Amino acid sequence: MTEQSIKDGQRPELPPFTLRNVLNDIYNGILALFTDPFCTRIICPVVIVLTSLLSKAIIYKVPYTEIDFRTYIQQIQIINDGELDYSLVQGDTGQIVYPAGFVQIYQVLNWLTDEGTDIHAGQTAFGYLLALTNFLVIIAYTMTPDFQPWPVYCLLLSKRLFSIYVLRLFNDCFTTVCMVSVTILLQQAAYWYKKGGSSISFLLTMVAADLYSIAISIKMNALLYFPGFIIVAYFLCGENLLKFGTVLLVIPIVQVLMGWKFLLPFFNDEEASYIRWNYINQAFNFNRKFLYKWTVNWRFVSEEFFLSDVFSNGLLIANASVLIFFIFTRYISPRITCKPVSRLIKDAMVGPFSSTINKNNLLIDPKCGPKLVMLILGSTNIIGILFARSLHYQFLSWYCWQLPFMLYMTGWSLLVCIPLWVVHEWCWNVFPSTPMSSGLLVSILAIVLFGVWYNTNEWFPKLADNEAATIDESGESKKDK
């Protein structure tokens, strides 16, 4: 039937009602639930509800496993009794090693669980925390235009992740929800830079810095995001060093406020200095050693090599090298910033208190910016995970929420991404870890990072109105040549 006949009100001709056509419709419907961006809005609320229901089912069916929660509560009770010296705050499994944000969160959990006696209340709270986290993750995902549904399903498929939340009650979960929120705030800042003005973007970036510092005060793994955070924040401040410095200043100020009772900033006597030093030394200890028996990612190296300084320093150098490579080939590429690196440096030195950002910078483009924020923060974090000194089982929560997105950003087929996800999940469910599970885990993370880096279509999409066509590789305008 012609288009004109449809406009005239006539019913379109339907395909014949046959078994083959019915099966074909069913197949297309199922395929759409995985690949049609329109279906993303349908399945998102379903996934959030299922997260909550699965958490409740696991709490009901699977016995709780005590690992560190009792120790956390014991430490909080000592602090609640008035102890400020971190060296004297300890529980069954050791001394307190987390900053003051951890203390404040677990003080609430101490009250909620009636000093640790009502574990079910704590499990329920963590179940809702997981549902909230997935809700926020979906918001972050769907700020990428035409986002397919299949990565959202992956949020339901990690047995280990559900265990970390509702059967272990680790503090890592709170850092994660903070970092997802930071990501959303920066995505919103990128989206509104042109639509709502740079002032709105600056305020959102300030709030993101506040929340980022809170995440660090819960657990220091949030520092893995720092290189990506400062790059994104710099551009969202319009390359204005005054605004950028203000954003960075928020981070230490929040740390001081969070740890006020342990830092004792208005006291300079010997006892106050001792308490202050013990807090800083234990809460922000970068020299902490890890036990080989708990490593998930380096079981394929010998224990002697694992514990050596050579291995530790090698990982640090590798981390820095890969990160620098990503920074110069992707994060601040002229194809994103629309100006060469030399011009970025010159603008920062010549006009530090003015906005020098190129209007075509992809990070402030409403369509491209939110996706690039997710890409930069996600790749920065996973680079840190790949070269981490050691990963323990609860550390999966640090990046599990980003992995489906990163797989999607490789541009690979669903038939490649899903098997990679399944094998990755298997690696985290092998206990104790084996050389094979560790080797596969490291390999998958490296492969995903390479795939994300290699897929230039996601990093350097064609700009609307062909604006990108006027910018060459050096960042200079072709029209000016």
From Swiss-Prot:
Catalytic activity: an alpha-D-Man-(1->2)-alpha-D-Man-(1->2)-alpha-D-Man-(1->3)-[alpha-D-Man-(1->6)]-beta-D-Man-(1->4)-beta-D-GlcNAc-(1->4)-alpha-D-GlcNAc-diphospho-di-trans,poly-cis-dolichol + a di-trans,poly-cis-dolichyl beta-D-mannosyl phosphate = an alpha-D-Man-(1->2)-alpha-D-Man-(1->2)-alpha-D-Man-(1->3)-[alpha-D-Man-(1->3)-alpha-D-Man-(1->6)]-beta-D-Man-(1->4)-beta-D-GlcNAc-(1->4)-alpha-D-GlcNAc-diphospho-di-trans,poly-cis-dolichol + a di-trans,poly-cis-dolichyl phosphate + H(+)
Pathway: Protein modification; protein glycosylation
Alphabetically ordered keywords of this record: Endoplasmic reticulum, Glycosyltransferase, Membrane, Transferase, Transmembrane, Transmembrane helix
Enzyme Commission number, as recorded: 2.4.1.258
Organism: Debaryomyces hansenii (strain ATCC 36239 / CBS 767 / BCRC 21394 / JCM 1990 / NBRC 0083 / IGC 2968) (Yeast)
Cystine pairings recorded for this chain: none
Superkingdom, natural source: Eukaryota
All ranges on the Cytoplasmic side of the membrane: 63-124, 194-197, 243-246, 330-367, 424-433
A GO CC term attached to the entry: endoplasmic reticulum membrane
GO-annotated biological processes: dolichol-linked oligosaccharide biosynthetic process
Membrane topology value: Multi-pass membrane protein
Residues annotated as transmembrane: 42-62, 125-145, 173-193, 198-218, 222-242, 247-267, 309-329, 368-388, 403-423, 434-454
Chain's role: Dol-P-Man:Man(5)GlcNAc(2)-PP-Dol alpha-1,3-mannosyltransferase that operates in the biosynthetic pathway of dolichol-linked oligosaccharides, the glycan precursors employed in protein asparagine (N)-glycosylation. The assembly of dolichol-linked oligosaccharides begins on the cytosolic side of the endoplasmic reticulum membrane and finishes in its lumen. The sequential addition of sugars to dolichol pyrophosphate produces dolichol-linked oligosaccharides containing fourteen sugars, including two GlcNAcs, nine mannoses and three glucoses.
GO molecular function, one term: dol-P-Man:Man(5)GlcNAc(2)-PP-Dol alpha-1,3-mannosyltransferase activity
Lumenal domain ranges by topology: 1-41, 146-172, 219-221, 268-308, 389-402, 455-481
Subcellular location: Endoplasmic reticulum membrane
Similarity comment: family membership: Belongs to the glycosyltransferase ALG3 family.
Pfam families from the UniProt entry: ALG3
Name assigned to this protein: Dol-P-Man:Man(5)GlcNAc(2)-PP-Dol alpha-1,3-mannosyltransferase
